[in-house]
Amino acid sequence: MSTINASSGIIEFTRIFLAVFYTCVAAFYTVKIIVAQIKQPVDLVLPGERFCSTWWNHMTFRFFRLSIWMVCLFRVFFEEIDNYLIMFTSLQTLPIIFTGISLMIFGFMMTIIVHLSMGDKWRSGIDSEGPKQLITNGFFKYSRNPIFLCVAISQIGFFLALPSVFTLVCLTIGLLMLYRQILSEEKHLTKLFVNEYKIYTASVRRWL
């Protein structure tokens, strides 16, 4: 496989792509939350009580999401930032980077689709007063956590698109926070729905 050094064009493309991609991600969630709260004035982002486990999950995820966005934006204007990311040059090949970009696009597009399919039932975090009913149809017939699955796919893609110590740390922490959040949500749903959730978990996998 030819290395990226043989084609500086893909480096510049990836640099711009990542900045645009994470700007779109930030814009999507910002617009979605604003529009949703206009339609129904309720809290949609529920990190939990301050310093509890789910609160730490949310804060850690927000920190890394903001860090990723800022790094990708600044890389467009300051190429020397790459020197501090500790790049894995052996992974900087066209097939790997294009695979990463493809996974990022696929993961994000599927995240949007799942979000839209949930309508006003979507929440970020655990609603102490809900949900009123267990969602088992649509994408939830195939995965108990379709949005988290799509986010994980996109995170893996980010590492492949920009293979470095920085993206590896982001991937590792990101997957850990997703897993911790899943465990907390499963515990909450088990208390709410008991037998119904037990039957659901027996027939549908946590991931896929």
Residue ranges and their predicted role:
Residues 1-129, 133, 155-188, 192, ...:
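Membrane-anchoring alpha-helices and their flanking helix-loop junctions
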